[in-house]
Every structure is written in structure tokens, then in C-alpha cells.
Swiss-Prot record:
Homodimer. It comes from Glaesserella parasuis serovar 5 (strain SH0165) (Haemophilus parasuis). It is an enzyme of class 3 (hydrolase). The active site is at S126, K163. GO terms for biological process: DNA repair; DNA replication; negative regulation of DNA-templated transcription; proteolysis; SOS response. Pfam families: LexA_DNA_bind, Peptidase_S24. It catalyses: Hydrolysis of Ala-|-Gly bond in repressor LexA. This is LexA repressor. GO terms for molecular function: DNA binding; serine-type endopeptidase activity. Its EC number is 3.4.21.88. Keywords: Autocatalytic cleavage, DNA damage, DNA repair, DNA replication, DNA-binding, Hydrolase, Repressor, SOS response, Transcription, Transcription regulation.
């Protein structure tokens, strides 16, 4: 049976639990989760853990503050390919062309909603206000159907960029989430622009160290 997709917050907590187990050898407590995510109370962490358990991603073990067991690691490990990491994109070629793939990460794309098709490494801090930081891996769902306000992966004159989309009249504005930067303004009648997909999640750069 296919697992339900996670919300962005559930995905963040799930990744933190996995990373904590990998780095310390034990699951985090509810207090540690609340501190990491920014909850005021461990009860909020408990509710999100229950949601993860209902969706089949973890098992909650009674009688211990660290009673969390990951249920989907084997599923990810059995995925020989995982999600491809896209590197430098050559002019005039599809973003997912085989020559652009640097490596694969053992990440199950179905853990994101909508499902991720590939990863992009973030360069720079243009989206730092919403937690997309330099060096992070951005999970991307491939689609041409986008709405104003979504964070998109766009190709502008063969340069790939991650920005928040706004269509206004004949122009397309690609807004950064950094007060020190100006938006990119594109007139499709004069410049080439193609929307490659939408951002559906972020994997911190230290998650694979």
C-alpha cells in the first residue's frame, strides 16, 4: 500500500529524526524535536509524530522518551537509483538529461508532496528567508503548471534559478527571498524562459556529511 504524502512540517520532523539517529545512534526526544523545529511545547512534536506513525513512516514505542523507530529506511535503501542530483545544465538540453546527473541520493521521491523528480544543489543565499540555504539540496517536482506565489525552478536564457514566481501582465517576476537582492524581470517576448518545476522540499547540506 502506498504511503500518504507528508506535509512540509512532517517531512522536516521526519528528516530530523532520521538525521539524529544517523549522527547519535538514537532517536531524539520530544523536547529535542520541539527545540529543533521551534515548537513551544513537546506536545506539538508528539502530535506530528503520531501523524507520521499513522502514515506509516515511523513506529512509536511506548515506555521510553526516545521510542521512535523509522519504518521506511529499507524502502529507500532498496531504491538503487534514488533521486538524481542535477549539476550544471548545458544550453538547449533538457534539465534531466543524463549528462547533467552528478550522482544519485537514496531519497524516496514519494516522501514529498507532490512527489519529487530530482534534486538541485542550491547556490547562493537568494532564498534564505524561507530556509533555502547555500549548499542545500532542493527537491523538485517536474511540472509546467505553476501558480503565482510558488517557488519555482526556472531556466532564463539557459541559466537555472530558484525564485518565487509572479506573473503580472506580459512580464514574469522571479522574486528572491533576500532583502538585499532585486527580482529578475523577464519579458518572454524578448528573453527565453521555461519553468522546469516547483520546489517541494529541502534537504540540509549537512544531512549527507
Amino acid at each position: 500500500m502506498k504511503r500518504q504524502h507528508l506535509t512540509a512540517r512532517q517531512q522536516e520532523i521526519f528528516e530530523f529524526v532520521k538525521n539524529h539517529i544517523e549522527s547519535t545512534g538514537m532517536p531524539p526526544t520530544r523536547v529535542e524535536i520541539a527545540r529543533e523545529i521551534g515548537f513551544k511545547s513537546p506536545n506539538a512534536a508528539e502530535e506530528h509524530l503520531k501523524a507520521l506513525a499513522r502514515k506509516g513512516y515511523i513506529e512509536m514505542l511506548s515506555g521510553t522518551s526516545r521510542g521512535i523507530r523509522i519504518l521506511v529506511e529499507d524502502e529507500a535503501a532498496n531504491d538503487e537509483e534514488g533521486l538524481p542530483l542535477i549539476g550544471k545544465v548545458a544550453a538547449g538540453t533538457p534539465i534531466e538529461a543524463i549528462e547533467h546527473i552528478e550522482k544519485h541520493y537514496p531519497v524516496n521521491g514519494a516522501m514529498f508532496s507532490p512527489a519529487a523528480d530530482y534534486l538541485l544543489k542550491v547556490n547562493g543565499n537568494s532564498m534564505e528567508k524561507i530556509g533555502i540555504l547555500d549548499g542545500d539540496l532542493l527537491a523538485v517536482h517536474k511540472t509546467k503548471s505553476v501558480r503565482n506565489g510558488q517557488v519555482v525552478v526556472a531556466r532564463v536564457d539557459d541559466e537555472v534559478t530558484v525564485k518565487r514566481l509572479e506573473k503580472k501582465g506580459d512580464l514574469i517576476y522571479l522574486h528572491p527571498e533576500n532583502d538585499e537582492l532585486e527580482p529578475i524581470v523577464v519579458d518572454p517576448r524578448q528573453s527565453y524562459i521555461e519553468i522546469e518545476g516547483i520546489a517541494v522540499g529541502v534537504i540540509r547540506s549537512n544531512a549527507w556529511m
